[in-house]
């Protein structure tokens, strides 16, 4: 039996690219359709497809990602899960998925959204049911100290329901979720790296959030037919309390977010400065913006009471619209112009530049942060003087990563490529030196890349070792599994002058952004402490059934291979709280618990405590059993729940 997949015209390289490019270009403006494939100063496209690589190169690539049994990866990767609503933990360079962290949606494996503790974090309705059961995670970032990751926290957004989740990186669990007020389509997210005023605070204390969809404010059914009154918000969340500190009312729709290393500036690239509600209205202007936020001034305005609130929210909202921020010396927000409908804004590791990718323009725009601050200080009469380069990169530039050696790597969606370009050379070219060859290399990817990131790319410690590329289409790269294809995450070695493709990885849709950092930056704990849980049962002797009328508390412990109660009895109609503590202290000795017909299943890790509520409404015998293998007598690890009629 042949293992070769049949190739049809629809799945050949040229047919595929022609189809996707034609379809995409049909929806873009005439300006993009007229762009050339290669900038005038760009070298020829690198032939980096799998068929072009010699056997020796393929062998080297395979060796670079292959780990021997028991060998550990050198990097962690935190990946968004898309409309799975979770965060994924990968090891690199192997690309192996190690863990999934449930955040915004229920997870049957661990009981997220089933236990009382997880439901409290997720948020519930008055009847105790989950407020939301869907989520769409796009962007994940981690906390900083001294310009590098410090291993405390990571954050991830939910675009559907405008929520932000915090991940504790000691246990790799979600511990807090906040719903942002006055916001729809919460998209871009980035923590600050320092305080804008106090240099001693050289670590993350704020997380900034951009809203993509503009809405009437308050969104109460009025002004729905007046798009000119719609606005978006830029939100600041406290990194520790997870409370919303303040919001800024702005023009335009936010895409991504970036922060400066000195803490003075945050930014969001924007499309639809026109304020249109329909597709064609959002692309009529030739240039959109990258909005810069002066954090110190915003917080001074809030402190001085120069804000308003909307609807039921008590969050202070300052005015960051263009009309109210014309005077540089008092402005809270500055709008640097960039080509229409930009996609992505990324901070260079040297702290000097933010780079916006053009999307509908074939360009990358380099903005020098010191010149933005000059405008705020009244030292520059023209804000766009901060643009130090705007150069052609290719068709459909979306996101940018860095190697710490002065090079940027930008995904080209329509070209199905990554372009490597030198930032300082691009600045020289923009200044008039047409001999400055800023494009260093191009590599084909498979296919239609979106997000991109490199090892340590968004820190001062960018090391230029590995580059990951999130491709939105996999097409013929993997065994067919029906109509729904996996996405394709591709890994490159970027330690040399040329990008070298190392591996393809099929992933369940649809991941978006991700970060990659050295494994020594986090110190995960393998066993919980009883003190982490107020309801912890510290001794099996505390087990039992405790009744207060119809309200019943069942205290249960597990220690392989047995539960502390052989059976327990309830009465029909009892309102039950079952508390389970895992008394095992050994790493990797996780227990599960399931109650047939009662829709209960969750796990407890070593020394973890969790609880569930249910009504004992079905008389009979119900064998509670352990779902997570922990002992040779795993099948025998059970207890009887007897509900008397």
Regions found by a protein language model. Name each.
Residues 604-645:
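Extracellular/periplasmic metallocenter environments
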